[in-house]
Structure formats: C-alpha cells, structure tokens
C-alpha cells in the first residue's frame, strides 16, 4: 500500500519570506514537499483563523518557488464546539472552499476523512486507500 511521509513545519510566521525567524530555513523544507496540509486552529475565540490562513498563504506566495501553487488541503482543527464550527465555516468561505475538512483529535471527528484526503491528494492515481 502507498505510504505518506509528513513533515511538520511549524515555524512559518509573518515575515518568514523576508527571513524573519527561521523563515528561509522552514520554507526551504516546504520546497521539497509534494503537497501541503494546512492545519488552522479554529478553537481560539481571540484568534481569527482567516487571518492566520492568509498570513501563511501570503508567505508562501512571497517566497516564490511555486509554493502557493502546490496542491493544498486546508483543514480546520479543534472543531469541538458550535463556535469553532462557525469559525471553520468562515475560514472555508474565505478560501473559496465548499468541501473544507473539520477535524478534532479529541473526538476523532474527520480523522478518517483526513487520511483519505491526504492519500488522494498525494496519490491521485490510486483509488482505494
């Protein structure tokens, strides 16, 4: 069966494409990826998930190397309340998605769907995972 290699790149912050923090170092790692999985925490009432998503998209575009054109799966995480579900819907609407994926590690919500979507994104030629 096909396998996935997943690299967690947590250090992309606003200004990363200008070298802020460990920006270049992390963005060089992203260059080697086949696809991007963008996890956005929607549980925090004081954080705007749309802004967080846009910051990362802008940094990828500013860095260049075609990163903003990579196949990307946008996932709302920590969706465990009605409020977080509303924030997830706003995120997907801003991203122009009709099929955004909501997950929760606590409840297990959407985890199997995430696995399927990751394999489909990475191995589009394989139909059964």
Predicted features along the sequence, with ranges:
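Switch I (G2) and immediately adjacent beta-strands of P-loop GTPase domains
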Residues: 1-16, 35, 41-42
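Short loop/turn elements that form and flank the Walker-type P-loop nucleotide-binding site
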Residues: 1-3, 30-33, 67-70, 96-97
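A general structural signal for well-ordered alpha-helical packing
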Residues: 3-6, 23, 53
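Structured core elements
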Residues: 5-6, 36-39, 73, 101-104
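A short glycine-/small-residue-rich loop at the edge of a beta-strand within enzyme catalytic domains
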Residues: 13, 17, 27, 43-47, ...
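Amphipathic coiled-coil/heptad-repeat helices and related helical stalk/stem segments
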Residues: 19-23, 84-87
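Inter-motif core of Ras-like GTPase G domains
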Residues: 21-44, 60-67
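C-terminal-of-GTPase-core extension/linker across diverse P-loop GTPases
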Residues: 45-129
């Amino acid at each position: 069966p096909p396998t996935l290699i997943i690299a967690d790149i947590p250090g992309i912050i606003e200004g990363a494409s200008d070298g802020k923090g460990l920006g270049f170092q992390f963005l060089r790692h992203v260059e080697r990826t086949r696809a991007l999985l963008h996890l956005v925490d929607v549980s925090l009432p004081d954080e705007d998930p749309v802004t967080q998503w846009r910051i990362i998209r802008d940094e990828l575009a500013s860095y260049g190397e075609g990163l903003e054109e990579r196949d990307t799966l946008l996932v709302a995480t920590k969706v465990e309340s009605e409020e977080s579900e509303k924030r997830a819907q706003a995120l997907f609407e801003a991203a122009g998605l009709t099929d955004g994926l909501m997950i929760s590690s606590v409840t297990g919500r959407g985890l199997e769907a995430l696995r399927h979507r990751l394999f489909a994104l990475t191995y589009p030629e394989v139909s059964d995972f």
